[in-house]
Regions:
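Active-site helix of classical SDR
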Residues: 128, 164, 172
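The beta1-alpha1 cofactor-binding region of Rossmann-like NAD(H)/NADP(H)-dependent oxidoreductases
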Residues: 43, 62-74, 223-224
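Alpha-helical segment proximal to the catalytic Tyr-Lys
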Residues: 133, 177-181, 239
């Protein structure tokens, strides 16, 4: 277990009512950070997360991150609640099939494609922009974007997802080069399949066995493994890894 002290540090974790976001919020709080838990639809779950976090001063906010203006307001609201923002974790995302095989009408396909890009790329970009304004004023900070293995190998039936995550990796690298002078570091994590509610339909039966067999470890990642990577990247020890994309895929895809 990584041992770090995040006392007097604050974090906004998007999509933290469940899955990787929840595990990340819990780990940051255990390390001493005050955490703002963001959700869109899981209000009950988000309240449960906040109630279970160790320490005091945590908060909860709702926002639709497919709207970049809402993403900007979310960051400002988190700063108001927390007093400052040291760590932004752009974790929220959607994974909705939109194949190009003609099974969807064009308008439906385009709407799903656009919503995927907005939620998985444009929203994090807007949140990062606003977080940088606050971090610059206070002398620095850290942004961590949760990307995907799909950015490298593509996602059949999910062209918007793969494109958005590839864009998120590139966004992270470009921001790292631009804001390093302001003592702001930017990182990305590229997990493969993770044992989450969103991935569960893909991990059942023979199809699930095939997914697990992609890794020589014959399993998928846990949410805690990804959360521990976030904790490391948010720590001072990881500062010189700014601009990197950390793979967490159990050697299921190497490049």
């Amino acid at each position: 277990m990584i041992t770090v002290d995040f006392s007097n540090r604050t974090a906004l974790v998007t999509g933290s009512s469940r899955g990787v976001g929840r595990a990340t919020a819990e780990l940051l709080a255990r390390a001493g950070a005050r955490v703002c838990v963001h959700y869109l639809n899981g209000e009950r779950e988000a309240k449960e997360v906040v109630a279970g976090l160790p320490g005091a001063g945590h908060s909860i906010l709702k926002a639709d991150l497919s709207d970049p203006r809402a993403a900007r307001i979310l960051v400002d609201s988190a700063v108001t609640k927390l007093g400052k923002l040291d760590i932004l974790v752009n974790n929220a995302g959607i994974f909705r099939r939109h194949p190009v095989d003609g099974s969807m009408a064009f308008d439906e396909w385009l709407a799903t494609f656009q919503q995927t890009l907005n939620t998985n790329l444009v929203g994090p970009a807007a949140a990062s922009f606003q977080a940088i304004q606050h971090m610059r004023q206070r002398g620095g900070g850290t942004i961590i974007n949760i990307g995907s293995r799909g950015a490298y190998r593509g996602e059949e039936g999910q062209v918007g997802y793969g494109a958005a995550k590839a864009g998120l990796h590139s966004l992270s690298q470009s921001l790292a080069r631009e804001v390093g002078k302001d003592n702001i570091t930017v990182h990305a994590i590229a997990p493969g399949f993770i044992e989450t509610a969103m991935a569960r339909p893909h991990l059942q039966g023979a199809a699930g066995e095939a997914v697990r067999a992609q890794s020589p470890l014959n399993r998928v990642a846990t949410v805690e493994e990804v959360a521990r990577a976030v904790l490391y990247l948010a720590s001072p020890e990881a500062k010189f890894t700014t601009g990197s994309v950390l793979d967490i895929n159990g050697a299921s895809y190497l490049h």
